[in-house]
């Protein structure tokens, strides 16, 4: 739950989350890619995001790609166009392959407390750096995460999605065989 709290909190404030491509690092290269060094993508085209409360400028993940059992550092920056207050919520969906693991609506401000952030988030420029300890035991496979975030008046804050691939851990000397 700590990892999902980090995802929820970062998505709402200057909006970051994590996702993993095991094969390669990914950088922004089309209008849906979040700028920076992460495989995060916007859910909607730029024209559809113009009225969102949060404008995400950059998200950097270190290491990219993240690895099970490692500390993931998330650096995010953006602009909050209006304060985010109590009552904000996130619709969060996590799938493992085609299996839905999580499909919930969560209190954004309550979840942000788990990563030492609090509502209200004031209007203005915001930069965040957070460390997340990834568990060692992440089952290998493809994960898809979507977080669609709204304020208490149902005004859209942001929506991000990511595809996450975790591979099997191997013994290093066996890789050369």
Swiss-Prot record:
Secretion signal, residue range per the UniProt entry: 1-17
Chain positions listed as propeptide in the UniProt record: 18-30
One BP annotation, GO: intracellular sterol transport
GO cellular component, one term: fungal-type vacuole lumen
Keyword Membrane attached: no
SUPFAM superfamilies: E set domains
Keywords: Lipid transport, Signal, Transport
GO molecular function, one term: sterol binding
Subunit structure: Monomer.
Task performed by this protein: Catalyzes the intermembrane transfer of phosphatidylglycerol and phosphatidylinositol.
Family indicated by similarity: Belongs to the NPC2 family.
Classification via PANTHER family: NIEMANN PICK TYPE C2 PROTEIN NPC2-RELATED, PHOSPHATIDYLGLYCEROL_PHOSPHATIDYLINOSITOL TRANSFER PROTEIN
Protein's recorded name: Phosphatidylglycerol/phosphatidylinositol transfer protein
